[in-house]
Each structure stands twice: as C-alpha cells, then as structure tokens.
Amino acid sequence: MSNPLNPNQTIAYLHAAARFIAEPQQPDGELRRLLREQYGIDARRLSRFTLLALLGALPLCQGLPENPAIYLASPFSSPSRMVSMRQKLAAGQPSPLDFMANLHNAATFQLAQILGSSGNSVFLAADAESCLSPLYAVLNALLAEPGQTVLLGWAYEQSGQDEQEGSVWWKISGSPMPQRQGWRIIMAAGGTAADLPHHTTFLPAALALDGRLHERGGLLLPPHGIWPALQIEPLAADE
C-alpha cells in the first residue's frame, strides 16, 4: 500500500496527557466523591469503569474546542457491574439501569455528555498486545478530518485482585495549540526500529507507553496498516 505521507510531514499534535490511578481497593464511593468535589459531577449511577475513565480524562477537558471526538480503549467495561447484574438476575430482581450503565460505550457517552460534545464517540476493544491500535484509529480519523481534536484514552477496571486500575488519556489534534507545548507525530527516519516497552496486561502496557513518552521525550512506533514507522517527538518552540 502506498505511503499517504510526505517525509517530515507532521501528522498530528499530542498536546497533553493525563492519568488517574486508583489506590488499591479504593471504594467506588471515594471515586464518586472525587468527581463531585473536583468537577461537580453527580456520579451516583455510574459504573466503576466509567468513574475511572472520567477521573483520568477530565483534567484534559479545559479549553477544548467544540465537539471533540472521544476514543476509549479497554479489554472490557465494568466487571463489578456485570457481577452485580448477574446476582440481581439470579435473585429475580433484574435492573435495566445496571444493564445500561455496563454498555461498553457508557463511559464515552458520559464524557460526551459532560463536554456537551456531538463529535465521534468510539469504544475500542483492545488488550496489551494491541494497545497501540486505538492511536492508529485516531490518526486515521485525523487523516480524514485534520481539524478535529480527539481525547484518546486507555481505561481498565480490575477483573481480579491486585491489578492496577485507572485510565491514561492523550489530547491529540491535527493542528498545533497557541502555547506550542507537547509533541508532534511524524514519519520516523528510515531504518529506525521501534523500541517499545512490553507488558502482558493492558493498563501497565498503556502506562508504560505514556511513561516512556515523558521520560525519554518521545516514542518510536512500528508500522501499522497504512502507516509507516512513526516518531513522537517534542514540539519545537517555533513550530
């Protein structure tokens, strides 16, 4: 397949990143309190998965343009809500609200509602091996519509004991911000090999990508679909 890019062409701009990592066994009530106190959000009916996603995304939501797109990736939505739903079914007390709260796109819907956005709202199933796929999906969207801004997130609710829970979010668009802060995504130099951290579980894989971006100042990404190898590098002040 032909390369859709020119050498040194800036494909997209990564303006900012944010994350929320829950404390071990942090109760839902504490997460709801954080949303209420920090953002004035009544989160009483939201699933744990949605709480974790919102707490990571909302720090990036100030000053967003109208109708940003939302892309969220995870292996699944809310294991705890599914357990509760099955228990109520077994007890003959089914709850339609539990079902609606556990739909895979409930978190993206809630975030879009908070932002008042009618932009694209997409949930993507992903695991540790495919945690870069959502980024390429965003780049595909920006290739088609460069003027949009996208909130890209990776969120995870534990399905077993002693797993990390939380979410990581990037704010990406096709044009630079006036502050000239962040990174740009360009074609990697010829012969450059990607050097990505390897993890077998989802959230640690996403956290490692985000951590390497900040610790080393950039990332080298492998070819994927129509995309050649890409590089995320710090944005120069004059760009």
Where are these regions (language model features)?
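Conserved "HGTGT" condensation-loop signature of ketosynthase/thiolase-family condensing enzymes
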Residues: 1-132, 140-239
